[in-house]
Amino acid sequence: MRGRLSIFENKINKFLRQKQDIMKNESFNLLIYNNMRNKQFIPLFLFFLFAASAVYGQFPGGRATFNFLSSPSSARLTGLGGTQISVSDSDINLVGSNPAVLNQNMTGKLGLNHFFLPGNIQSGNAAYAFTIADNKTWLHLGLHFIQYGEMPRTDEYFQTNGTFKANENRMSVGVAHSIDDRLQIGSTLSFAQSSLGEFVSSALVLDAGLFYTDSSKLTTIGIVYRNAGLQLNPYFSGNSKEPLPNDIQIAISKKLRYLPFRFTLLYNHLNRWNVRYYNPDNESARLIIGEELAEPAQIAIFVDNLFRHIILNGELIVGANENFKLRMAYNHRSRMEFGTVGVGGLNGFSFGFGLKIKRFSFDFGRSIYHLGGGLTHIGITTQLKKNIF
């Protein structure tokens, strides 16, 4: 039966599944907030993160199922390198990366986004938020879908036997609470389902995050543990359950005092150090050149691996009401994994813009993955005149 899905697996692995290597746990330092009213929360959150890191480290190779959970949920996030966990404004779509950034300015907002993927694969997101208690606790609802379309059904001998359809969906409900004017916490609980023809799998997913703002309101810090949870049932009866694509991220954003610009430094995959992988293209280069290529120095390997954890992005903000935004980001891991040996290009870079007209916001994002092209994301967000709930 596995052979029936061979074409589908080749298709989605190329675009939605990043190659991963053996993992190592890494300790890390989190922010310390001395003036926090609830001082018991930080130790509990630290314990939660480290415990999750230890559990995830048990899965050899770091391979996971439900990798669509890691895809960017909005055009703005695509333009900022795929994620943004340390910014909180009026954009409801930001809760897709960190549920703790939900705030009063997002209530009553409805966000709709569509992602154009290769092979006519279509993906979309919807998000909505509202207040539930004293303007300090907010709830958000979300829906994420991917339609892979109709594909040939083949057996292990690559003989075509009809067609099948495949899709993946995620339904979410999340909550955020403001402890005081500088610290917020939040979490999102999701039910995810994946259907590959007659083979169906489901999962329960949890995101948990922190968001901190300094006294100047110019520096913000975000910490999030994404895609914790478990696979409820595997695709094939009797098979062992697979891990989800867990990712612990920390980021700091700085808005310049005298210039309308904000930059962000994000470090992802805190729960494993080695994110490099064996690249067979290097072997092809050896064959073409006809001689052995020198192995990279250990310091070069260390630096390359370090920068694969990092995403850099910037956002130029124009207008007193932030009516226009230009965005650009660089993801070194994407550049190295999707690049062609000996050939340059813009893979790893992404860009986009946002335009606000009255109560409507329009966003465009494009991420360059390969010389052959990139992925385009568009979105619209509006303030509803009357709350749904």
Cite the ranges covered by each PLM segment.
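Bacterial Sec-dependent N-terminal signal peptides
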Residues: M1-G61, G314, G374
